[in-house]
From Swiss-Prot:
It catalyses: uridine(38/39/40) in tRNA = pseudouridine(38/39/40) in tRNA. Pfam families: PseudoU_synth_1. It comes from Streptococcus pneumoniae serotype 19F (strain G54). The lineage of its organism: Bacteria, Bacillati, Bacillota, Bacilli, Lactobacillales. This is tRNA pseudouridine synthase A. Keywords: Isomerase, tRNA processing. Its EC number is 5.4.99.12. PANTHER family: PSEUDOURIDYLATE SYNTHASE (PTHR11142), TRNA PSEUDOURIDINE SYNTHASE-LIKE 1 (PTHR11142:SF0). One of its GO terms (biological process) is tRNA pseudouridine synthesis.
Length: 249
């Protein structure tokens, strides 16, 4: 068997997430269907580095899969790209070692969350940015977001029901910028891994702080008490993008 690593992007609007679902459309299933066709009907299993939720987009998701033969990488990329649905793009494909695993190989991820605070709301952006038409103190949010950097137990920012026991993660970058029009805010988070709905919960909390409904110090309290009830609501998925995955050499 020959193992390939691929970088893909997708519009998450019409997907129930990356991971295969029993009764809903998923990115994993669509790519597996295309690869199976290319492999003359023999089933190919795809593994993903991250499991994006329903409605979440990806600019640089990484997958790997095995084929029973070796094929020119660009020809394989072109075939997979052109035969996959329009809301999936295959950016690159490369041959990797047989023991490479996109999920377990040491890597870091970068996510972006796009917020649209324009009024009136632009319906053309509704699937690709989360609308928030309320007042925001950006400076307060920029102070608060820096408190998330470093190694912490992020239990207080995790959705209930997660089976992960170790909730300690390291965030190497947490930043917030505003575009020149003042309409769009981009939250950026980079780290060695993120918990279930962690980023959306952090953004929801930062919006509460920016709206003066929580103090800046609320971040410290959530990290200290590890209590989800102290954090803000979960932000909508449509503004979230898996931007990049970087592997250590």
């Amino acid at each position: 068997m020959t193992r390939y690593k691929a970088t893909i992007s997708y519009d998450g609007y019409a997907f129930a997430g990356f991971q295969r679902q029993s009764h809903a459309r998923s990115v994993q299933e669509e790519i597996e269907k295309t690869l199976t066709r290319l492999n003359k009907g023999q089933t190919i299993t795809v593994h993903g580095a991250g499991r994006t939720d329903s409605g979440v987009h990806a600019l640089g998701q990484v997958i790997h899969f095995d084929l029973p033969y070796q094929m020119d990488e660009e020809k394989l990329r072109f075939a997979l790209d052109t035969q996959s649905p329009e809301d999936i793009d295959v950016i690159s494909i490369e041959l990797v070692a047989d023991d490479f695993h996109c999920r377990y190989a040491k890597h870091s991820k970068t996510y972006e969350f796009i917020l649209d605070r324009g009024r009136p709301k632009n319906p053309m952006r509704r699937h690709y940015a989360t609308h928030f038409p309320y007042p925001l103190d950006v400076e307060r949010m920029q102070i608060a977001i820096k408190k998330l950097e470093g190694t912490h137990d992020f239990t207080g920012f995790t959705a209930s029901g997660t089976s992960v026991e170790d909730k300690v993660r390291t965030i190497t970058e947490a930043s917030l910028i505003v575009d020149e029009t003042g309409q769009f805010l981009t939250f950026t988070f980079s780290g060695n891994g993120f918990l279930y709905k962690q980023i959306r919960n952090m953004v929801g909390t930062l919006l509460k702080i920016g709206n003066n409904r929580m103090p800046v110090e609320q971040i410290d309290l959530i990290l200290e008490k590890k209590d989800r009830q102290l954090a803000g609501p979960t932000a909508a998925p449509n503004g979230l993008y898996l931007k990049e995955i970087r592997y250590e050499e």
